[in-house]
Amino acid sequence: MHAMTFAHRILGFAAGALLLAGCGGGNAIAPGQTSLLPPGIARGAHTNRAESWMAPEATGEDLLYVSDADGVVDVFSYPAGKLVGVLKGFASPAGLCSDPDGNVFVTDINNLNVLKYKHGGKKPIQTLVDFGHYPFGCAVDPGTKNLAVANYASTLSFGPGSVSVFVGGKGEPHSYEDQTFNAYFFCGYDSQGNLFVDGADYGSYHTQFAELAKNSSTLTNITLNQTIGYPGGVQWDGKYMAVQDAYTHTIYRFSFSGSSGTSMGAVHIKGDESGLLAQFWIDGKTVVLPYGTQARAVHSVGFWPYTKGGNHSQSFTVAHATELVGVTVSLAKK
């Protein structure tokens, strides 16, 4: 297995790409913008897991987990932002997700697996092997406890990615592919157990969006009525599916009917100048997002009002951060 390289992760596109909705179920990626997955993913840090630590009080607090592509996941009290732990031993941690029990899942791209941690735990309690794929985003269905993983690419000649679903959050995954996708980025379950995933087509000319309906074995392309310049995070917000446009710093809220998605509103995020892809996380009336105040650097975490958007209401800088990628909020059992 060859580790992902910087060149593989450049999702370039022609300057003449059209900003038109929905050819083949996707939207054109905006011209003039070269979006990159975080540079740290190529490094393959392999930090020592034995060096992980967690403050004793962490198990009783709500926690914010933040992945750094250089091989660690920082853990903060939420919403105070006090560092209470650091998880180590990853090659290249990326997308994060959590379940209603407070368990946290960390995709580790170059290790081809997803690690599960108890709320406030410093050692993984489960390793889910995603062999043959580079996992990037993840989501948990609260009803079935199925874990879905958006695989950026396959390890075989760096071929097209896929979606892996670990039924009940264990065992070997079921794999799903869509011929219009090349790279898969993020995914999210709605309240009915339907899975939605975004990504890009061959050459990264268009954003792609698809649904794996509950109990279905086929990904169905979804045509969105709103252009997505560059696909980012996907998460259910309690009413609509929130889909991030990393190019315009906007989170759109979609409802779906058949193979069509209709935007029901937009949340504009101000203050991010990094130009890099990072995952958001919605917690009630707050959306949390890693961001940067200068190009190609994501070293801070901000909280924005959801669904008002605008300027962040709170932020903090992560000490010694290399390139922040994903976030998730894990709630303590009360």
What are these regions (language model features)?
Residues 77-81, 117-122, 167-171, 212-217, ...:
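Short loop/turn segments that connect beta-strands within beta-propeller blades
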Residues 24-27:
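Bacterial signal peptide processing site
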Residues 40-61, 89-101, 131-146, 150-154, ...:
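Beta-rich, blade/repeat-based domains predominating
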